[in-house]
């Protein structure tokens, strides 16, 4: 599979997608890092599969390596986790000439990337995403953040990695639920940018067929995202389209205190619900929400939810970063593969 490059001038970086890459991390790191110390941040689940393997191969290449394992789950991506990471970095005497590796899913990538961006005003880092969601979405584009009690990603920055290493083989150790979680983001790309890709995903009959095409799928998603990021790095226009389903999805995650739905499951619900609302308002072609519902059902993803206190959800939506001066930009579809921004307000969802 051809390597991709996110073209951002001096901050450009490659995305390498290759089966078996997890066993060649040291070779790729040597191409971008000439220092001595490497700090690996992971969680206990991922660490049990790949932590010692990667640490050992880096040590054999002459690096001084420290591995830190955190508890898995969204609760770890909290502001309060940062001092724990900073203290480990200080104990290891990491300097700005050293390297941080984030080995894990979106939580570790976001959390570790934000720690890298803020420690000593910035330490280089490399993303090694191990979940499908992180491989197709969160590892690319330089958005790093932590959560606050009142919402997701409320403290963050734009800080790009030096390199993204994607090994589709690591998905074999991913649970079925989190594989489906990632497929929600895959489906999103078809919804917003590529009708042909959407129907290709619909044509796949089962997980075996998906896995037989997984490199192609990951490559397509990363290609779409890298093109969008190159055109709108700081999320002021086109890049907002990548948030299709996320405004409502983030609110649903927060409403259930990040315990009932995974990120992808919440986004799946958000994509269907906002399309249904938009159809009723004449802003989306009729039948689009049904197409989305069908593909979500096909991939065993939820598409609707009962909310007892809608005011709480609306309060969370009001905190969305796309809500500026009480003008909320929501991402809608005209049709499958054709997305746009609609200026409205929080009442759009009521």
Curated annotation (Swiss-Prot):
<dbReference type="InterPro" id="IPR030963">
    <property type="entry name" value="DHQ_synth_fam"/>
</dbReference>
<feature type="binding site">
    <location>
        <position position="152"/>
    </location>
    <ligand>
        <name>NAD(+)</name>
    </ligand>
</feature>
<dbReference type="InterPro" id="IPR050071">
    <property type="entry name" value="Dehydroquinate_synthase"/>
</dbReference>
<feature type="binding site">
    <location>
        <position position="143"/>
    </location>
    <ligand>
        <name>NAD(+)</name>
    </ligand>
</feature>
<keyword id="KW-0057">Aromatic amino acid biosynthesis</keyword>
<keyword id="KW-0862">Zinc</keyword>
<keyword id="KW-0456">Lyase</keyword>
<dbReference type="GO" id="GO:0008652">
    <property type="term" value="P:amino acid biosynthetic process"/>
</dbReference>
<comment type="pathway">
    <text>Metabolic intermediate biosynthesis; chorismate biosynthesis; chorismate from D-erythrose 4-phosphate and phosphoenolpyruvate: step 2/7.</text>
</comment>
<keyword id="KW-0028">Amino-acid biosynthesis</keyword>
<dbReference type="Pfam" id="PF01761">
    <property type="entry name" value="DHQ_synthase"/>
</dbReference>
<feature type="binding site">
    <location>
        <begin position="130"/>
        <end position="131"/>
    </location>
    <ligand>
        <name>NAD(+)</name>
    </ligand>
</feature>
<dbReference type="InterPro" id="IPR056179">
    <property type="entry name" value="DHQS_C"/>
</dbReference>
<keyword id="KW-0547">Nucleotide-binding</keyword>
<dbReference type="GO" id="GO:0005737">
    <property type="term" value="C:cytoplasm"/>
</dbReference>
<comment type="similarity">
    <text>Belongs to the sugar phosphate cyclases superfamily. Dehydroquinate synthase family.</text>
</comment>
<dbReference type="GO" id="GO:0009423">
    <property type="term" value="P:chorismate biosynthetic process"/>
</dbReference>
<feature type="binding site">
    <location>
        <position position="185"/>
    </location>
    <ligand>
        <name>Zn(2+)</name>
    </ligand>
</feature>
<protein>
    <recommendedName>
        <fullName>3-dehydroquinate synthase</fullName>
        <ecNumber>4.2.3.4</ecNumber>
    </recommendedName>
</protein>
<dbReference type="GO" id="GO:0009073">
    <property type="term" value="P:aromatic amino acid family biosynthetic process"/>
</dbReference>
<dbReference type="GO" id="GO:0003856">
    <property type="term" value="F:3-dehydroquinate synthase activity"/>
</dbReference>
<dbReference type="Pfam" id="PF24621">
    <property type="entry name" value="DHQS_C"/>
</dbReference>
<feature type="binding site">
    <location>
        <begin position="106"/>
        <end position="110"/>
    </location>
    <ligand>
        <name>NAD(+)</name>
    </ligand>
</feature>
<dbReference type="GO" id="GO:0000166">
    <property type="term" value="F:nucleotide binding"/>
</dbReference>
<keyword id="KW-0963">Cytoplasm</keyword>
<feature type="binding site">
    <location>
        <position position="246"/>
    </location>
    <ligand>
        <name>Zn(2+)</name>
    </ligand>
</feature>
<dbReference type="GO" id="GO:0046872">
    <property type="term" value="F:metal ion binding"/>
</dbReference>
<dbReference type="InterPro" id="IPR016037">
    <property type="entry name" value="DHQ_synth_AroB"/>
</dbReference>
<keyword id="KW-0520">NAD</keyword>
<keyword id="KW-0479">Metal-binding</keyword>
<comment type="function">
    <text>Catalyzes the conversion of 3-deoxy-D-arabino-heptulosonate 7-phosphate (DAHP) to dehydroquinate (DHQ).</text>
</comment>
<keyword id="KW-0170">Cobalt</keyword>
<dbReference type="InterPro" id="IPR030960">
    <property type="entry name" value="DHQS/DOIS_N"/>
</dbReference>
<feature type="binding site">
    <location>
        <position position="263"/>
    </location>
    <ligand>
        <name>Zn(2+)</name>
    </ligand>
</feature>
């Amino acid at each position: 599979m051809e390597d991709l490059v996110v073209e951002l001038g001096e901050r450009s970086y490659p995305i390498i997608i290759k089966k078996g890459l997890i066993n060649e991390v040291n070779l790729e790191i040597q191409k971008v890092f000439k220092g001595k110390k490497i700090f690996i941040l992971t969680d206990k689940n991922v660490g049990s599969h790949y932590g010692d393997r990667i640490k050992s191969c880096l040590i054999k290449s002459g690096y001084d390596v420290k591995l830190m394992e955190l508890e898995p789950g969204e609760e770890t991506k909290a502001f309060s986790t940062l001092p724990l990471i900073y203290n480990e970095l200080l104990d290891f005497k990491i300097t700005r000439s050293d390297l941080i590796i984030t080995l894990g899913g979106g939580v570790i990538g976001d959390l570790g990337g934000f720690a890298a961006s803020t420690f000593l005003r910035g330490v280089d880092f490399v993303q090694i995403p191990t979940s499908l969601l992180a491989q197709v979405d969160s590892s690319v584009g330089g958005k790093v953040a932590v959560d606050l009690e009142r919402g997701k990603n409320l403290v963050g920055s734009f800080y790009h990695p030096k390199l993204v290493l994607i090994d589709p083989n690591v998905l074999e150790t991913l649970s079925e639920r989190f594989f489906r979680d990632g497929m929600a983001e895959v489906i999103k790309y078809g919804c917003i940018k590529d009708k042909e890709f959407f129907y290709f995903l619909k044509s796949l009959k089962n997980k075996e067929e998906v896995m037989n095409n997984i490199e192609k799928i990951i490559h397509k998603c990363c290609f779409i995202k890298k093109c969008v990021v190159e055109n709108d790095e700081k999320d002021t226009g086109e890049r907002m389209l990548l948030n299709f389903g996320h405004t409502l999805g983030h609110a649903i995650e927060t409403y259930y205190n990040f315990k009932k739905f995974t990120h992808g499951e919440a986004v799946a619900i958000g994509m269907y619900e906002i399309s249904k609302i938009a159809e009723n308002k004449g802003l989306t072609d009729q039948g689009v929400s049904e197409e989305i519902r069908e593909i979500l059902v096909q991939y065993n993803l939820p598409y609707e939810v009962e909310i007892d206190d809608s005011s709480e959800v609306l309060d969370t939506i009001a905190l969305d970063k796309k809500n500026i001066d009480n003008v909320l930009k929501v991402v809608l579809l005209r049709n499958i593969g054709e997305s746009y921004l609609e200026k409205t307000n929080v009442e759009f969802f009521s």
